[in-house]
Amino acid sequence: MQNTILIHAPGRRQGRGALVLAYTALFALLMGIWAAIFALNGQSFIQYGDTLKQHYPFLVYYGRWLRQAARCVLTGAAVPTWDFSIGYGADIITTLSYYGLGDPLDLLAAFVPGRWTEQLLEGLIVLRLYLAGLAFMAFSRRHGNSRFGTLLGALAYVFSAWPIQAGLIEPVFLVPMYCFPLMLLGADDLFEGRSPVLYIAAIALTALSNFLFFYMAAVLLVLYAIAVYSKRYGAKNLRTLPPLLAKFIGFALVGIAISAVTLLPTAQELFGSARFGLTRETAPYPFYRFFELLANMTTGMGYDAYSTYAGVTSAAFLGVLVLFAKPRQNTVLKCAWLGLLALLLVPQAGSVLNGISYVSNRWVWAFTMLEAFILARVCPGITAFEPKEKRNLFALLAIYCVVAFCVKQGRTETALLGALLLVLLAVCWRQMASAAAVCRLFYWRAAALAW
């Protein structure tokens, strides 16, 4: 007989607080390890590149401009909106909006002296990652995932390849990680007939923070809404579509109107820029790209010329294999994963999601979020397999290892290490059951002590 641990579970509000507390503690621990690795190598989160050459000067300038604007308001003077020190002279709002002029978090620059801006920028990177995990947990719990699975999914989401590789080079790339889950939660509210406040606020926040990522999030939101509508209503209830569509569009326009002060000038400037209008031949990806992409699913070091940082932890990718090992379950999630994987293999998708410009998979944070959500969904049953499901899992694992490393581009040290960890996790699934039980026990005991 399988041993079970019986323990009184906290109430709903108490359990929510315990979940946030557990996430905060683990996030602080892992972030401390991450920061220690940088410190031991004599580095900080501010990497040479756009972070140092663009985002750091922006934050220094923005803090100075905010303080000057506050003095102008208090004295009745005009707030400066043009600066001749930017190039040969440029509009301040239009020039700086890409870097987060409308992002509420960047308003902290007004209270930090210029000499402390480096620490502020590093702190904002950590804060955005923390908020990304909180937003993911809210979305995951709304869709019925367990607290323990949600906790694992949030950590897999936050410490994936995208924030490590792209977020440190361009801190603004972290914005959609916490804005997009809020947009999805707002969409769920509209489907369920709830208040549109969250939907409007999420639209406005994303559009204020960065126009390009708002565009990507909007396209992906449409795909999400189509999937939810198809599952909820189906093709036989199309009479519900017009009023629902009117609500989605109408409330989205309200959110866009709120953000118009930075959104419209930024969009005009962006669409008129030479870089944005740059066209390149969108030839098919090389044959080995599929194998290279699979090999890098379990590593944070995968890189190509298209910003395809799709790596997650080995545990998260094991969740994907478990998902497909169990037939006739979570069909929508399976279709979603295959659909987004297909988009990563089509260069035209990267062009469309990059504003119909050059090919770039900067939307891959959504793929990472999906894999983290899959881990949260399958976590309760990750150690409970029927004999057929167990055979399916190891067959998928064998296929992955063969396919991922059949070309030399995929046989990197980090990819091999990630695959090795994946195999070890799959082989030690019985021990994982005991470890999961102990972790759940510790989780509820900590909740009881904390509350």
Please annotate each region the language model reported:
Residues 1-38, 243, 247, 430-431, ...:
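Start-transfer (signal-anchor) and selected internal transmembrane alpha helices
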Residues 27, 129-143, 147-232, 244-267, ...:
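Membrane-embedded helix bundles of polyisoprenyl
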Residues 30-136, 155-177, 270-275, 282-309, ...:
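Membrane-interface coil-to-helix junctions
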Residues 94-99, 118-130, 156-184, 191-192, ...:
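Membrane-interface micro-motifs in multi-pass membrane enzymes
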Residues 132-139, 179-191, 219-227, 317-320, ...:
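Transmembrane alpha-helical segments
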Residues 213, 335-342, 354, 360-451:
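Contiguous transmembrane helix-bundle modules in multi-pass membrane proteins
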